[in-house]
Amino acid sequence: MSCSHLSTAWSSSALASSASTTRRRSPPRSGLLVRCSLRELRTRIDSVRNTQKITEAMKLVAAAKVRRAQEAVVSSRPFSEALVEVLYNMNQEIQTEDIDLPLTRTRPVKKVALVVLTGERGLCGSFNNNVLKKAETRIDELKQLGLQYTVVSVGKKGNAYFQRRPYIPLERDLEVSSVPTVKDSQAICDLVYSLFVSEEVDKVELLYSKFVSLVRSDPIIQTLLPMSPKGEICDVNGVCVDATEDELFRLTTKEGKLTVEREKVKIETQPFSPVVQFEQDPVQILDALLPLYLNSQILRALQESLASELAARMSAMSSATDNAIELRKNLSIAYNRQRQAKITGEILEIVAGADALAG
């Protein structure tokens, strides 16, 4: 194998390794590169330098986009808070246990729809792989429970994954824009709404990657339908959490490095004024607000998934940049040794020729 092929193969594997895991591979032994010509070594050094510039630029772009993704989550929070407040107060006005709303109607579970949110691009570490592994695990659990299931895939990576596995029933594969919008969440909301209301499925679960920190994201499963009329978010085990209690994540800089500050806040809901009167039946208002709340929860999951993907890409590109720096260092050492050996050999030849002429 020539020097060019050898170092090309290693640099490609190093970049692929950084894209699939943050664990760094060991660089090639310099002894393997000593046999290469100086021209090949210079070519490889230039190639690795260019790769380093690309990965470093992708790291900086991902870091900037993470900030914007977090700002999007924070900016959309007031609307969600106000919507939850209305749901709380509406629930106090009426007896929700005695009414029948389509999105809160519970029935024996025979079929489950699993909505899987993945990324639109690669080079983001194990982000997509972790979500898809979680999906496979959940599918196995549903099989063991004897339940039917169908998958709604959102994201190019998930779409390609499930399309290569025809044994997994795929209800629909959707793609979203690079920055999640209400239009994207509305398409998902309309699909799961029709599946649940038409009783094609009895339960809808949402699988996405929750943003924890810049180096960690946890794939979680949340029950979308049936919904809780009290504005609660429930997991697959039926454990519900107050939606007004949330963790804010602030992306800041500390000692020249990006870090995340976490702060748990509790939002106090204020009751409506006694003079407030509803022109329509409260049940009709609640029936109209629940789909809107469902849409806001899907949009929130899309935004969190995007933030997790960008953080994973930033970490992967940082590791790839470190690998490129280390490979460039080893190639430079091999180049200098080869150049020194060549110069020493030429000097010895000159000295030997001079001695021969003198003798």
Swiss-Prot record:
Q: How does it sit in the membrane?
A: Peripheral membrane protein
Q: Which GO terms describe its molecular function?
A: proton-transporting ATP synthase activity, rotational mechanism
Disulphides: 234-240
Q: Where is the transit peptide?
A: 1-35
Q: Which family does it belong to?
A: Belongs to the ATPase gamma chain family.
Q: What does this protein do?
A: Produces ATP from ADP in the presence of a proton gradient across the membrane. The gamma chain is believed to be important in regulating ATPase activity and the flow of protons through the CF(0) complex. Inceptin is a proteolytic fragment produced by insect larvae that previously ingested the protein. This peptide mediate plant perception of herbivory through the induction of volatile, phenylpropanoid and protease inhibitor defenses such as ethylene, jasmonic acid and salicylic acid for example.
What name does UniProt use for this protein?
ATP synthase subunit gamma, chloroplastic
Organism of origin is: Zea mays (Maize)
